[in-house]
UniProtKB/Swiss-Prot annotation:
UniProt source species: Abies firma (Momi fir)
Sequence positions that bind substrate: N116, T166, K170, R288, H320, S372
Matches recorded under Gene3D superfamilies: Ribulose bisphosphate carboxylase, large subunit, C-terminal domain, RuBisCO large subunit, N-terminal domain
Name of the protein: Ribulose bisphosphate carboxylase large chain
Record site: Transition state stabilizer: K327
GO CC entries: chloroplast
NCBIfam families: PRK04208.1
EC number(s) given by UniProt: 4.1.1.39
Main location, first listed in the record: plastid
GO biological process: photorespiration; reductive pentose-phosphate cycle
Keywords: Calvin cycle, Carbon dioxide fixation, Chloroplast, Disulfide bond, Lyase, Magnesium, Metal-binding, Methylation, Monooxygenase, Oxidoreductase, Photorespiration, Photosynthesis, Plastid
Broadest EC class assigned to this enzyme: lyase
Length: 443
């Protein structure tokens, strides 16, 4: 009988994939997973299982393992730390060698790191809390089409947050009435108006008609105000070809910005669109529809900061990032954590803000965070203070819900933001005097 090469059967992952002595390399992609194992599964085994299944491992030793260098290609669980206040949870840190990932592909990055392990039997729940993207990998991405500085230069708007408004009712308006609402908001003083994320091309309003009427509204408002205006024309579609067709038509109309739903549209489509936008001078607004399906559970899924980093690599000039206002204090620090990850070049590790790794983006352009959803003019002082100048504040109902109509609603928001910025620049405390500032401005 043939001599036995190795023993068949199920093998403990930790023998190969748990390596506490490992020194991480500057080129490694690092991940922090919140792991909740099944009862009886030791932390080292669960952490190693995650490292194995998201890199080179399978449940047994295979002959072809001998044809490669596992040491060079395997993911490694290099550290495990308990989670305060949680008996059965811990953070597993995993290092992945750079060569496991295709250059310039967020799609491949996610397929590898979160593609398979989340259904793993030995785990009750698994959440990816953060990723460290090394410059060696981030440099293979184009990133945002233009970034914050280029956008300000294109729009000629400096020293204040930009203002937007989602056109409501989001479904049911005809293209002409929709265009009229766009015109009224832009004419009143907003910088942008927005297609809702689910406005694509429905029977009551086909995309081409909407694009034409919105372009007319933009041109009219620009001519009357002397300011550069935009409307986020949603190019999201059922196929990549159709999406590109819409983006190309937007460029032909001469509008400054288009929009995409990056999670429902997918990273591959989003990256293609981002490349087109840079090549053709279009800004790209990104909506995060479907994010809560992935990021809402505290112990399973992915934190939004990971989706935000992925978007910065895939490409977008704006991305929705929550509002903070009216929520808990802790939420504020965590939100500002990923807002910094979107805007800044270098972000220090800071666990109090949920940032598990120091992230160096080198020279990748930044993304403007968009605060949107249930905010109105009385939130303006808080929003100005929390988000600072490099942000887009979007008031849908907070503009169109004004008792006097759309244009007065837009005027109210513009007056409020300028009053808040001026008060802040004069050294007034917006947290304390915010309401007073708004009252004075409204006279």
């Amino acid at each position: 009988k043939a001599s036995v090469g190795f023993k068949a059967g199920v093998k403990d992952y930790r023998l190969t994939y748990y390596t506490p002595e490992y020194q991480t390399k500057d080129t490694d992609i690092l991940a922090a997973f919140r792991v909740t194992p099944q009862p009886g599964v030791p932390p080292e085994e669960a952490g190693a299982a995650v490292a194995a299944e998201s890199s080179t491992g399978t449940w047994t030793t295979v002959w072809t393992d001998g044809l490669t260098s596992l040491d060079r290609y395997k993911g490694r669980c290099y550290d495990i730390e308990p989670v305060a206040g949680e008996e059965s949870q811990f953070i597993a840190y995993v290092a992945y060698p750079l060569d496991l990932f295709e250059e310039g592909s967020v799609t491949n990055l996610f397929t590898s790191i979160v593609g398979n392990v989340f259904g793993f039997k030995a785990l009750r729940a698994l959440r990816l809390e953060d990723l460290r993207i090394p410059p060696a990998y981030s440099k293979t991405f184009q990133g945002p089409p233009h970034g914050i500085q280029v956008e300000r230069d294109k729009l000629n708007k400096y020293g204040r947050p930009l203002l937007g408004c989602t056109i409501k009712p989001k479904l049911g308006l005809s293209a002409k009435n929709y265009g009229r609402a766009v015109y009224e908001c832009l004419r009143g003083g907003l910088d942008f108006t927005k297609d809702d994320e689910n406005v694509n091309s429905q029977p009551f309003m086909r995309w081409r008609d909407r694009f034409v009427f919105c372009a007319e509204a933009i041109n009219k408002a620009q001519a009357e105000t002397g300011e550069i205006k935009g409307h986020y024309l949603n190019a999201t579609a059922g196929t990549c070809e159709e999406m590109m067709k819409r983006a190309i038509f937007a460029r032909e109309l001469g509008v400054p910005i288009v929009m995409h739903d990056y999670l429902t549209g997918g990273f591959t489509a989003n990256t293609s669109l981002a490349h087109y936008c840079r090549d053709n001078g279009l800004l790209l607004h990104i909506h995060r529809a479907m994010h809560a399906v992935i990021d809402r559970q505290r112990n399973h899924g992915m934190h939004f900061r990971v989706l935000a980093k992925a978007l910065r690599m895939s490409g977008g000039d704006h991305v929705h990032a929550g509002t903070v206002v009216g929520k808990l204090e802790g939420e504020r620090d965590v939100t500002l954590g990923f807002v910094d990850l979107l805007r800044d070049d270098f972000i220090e590790k800071d666990r109090s803000r949920g940032i598990y790794f120091t992230q160096d983006w080198v020279s990748m352009p930044g993304v403007l965070p968009v605060a949107s959803g249930g905010i109105h003019v009385w939130h303006m002082p808080a929003l100005t203070e929390i988000f600072g100048d490099d942000s887009v504040l979007q008031f849908g109902g907070g503009t169109l819900g004004h008792p006097w109509g759309n244009a007065p609603g837009a005027v109210a928001n513009r007056v409020a933001v300028e009053a808040c910025v001026q008060a802040r620049n004069e050294g007034r405390d917006l947290a304390r005097e915010g309401n007073e500032v708004i009252r004075e401005a409204s006279k």
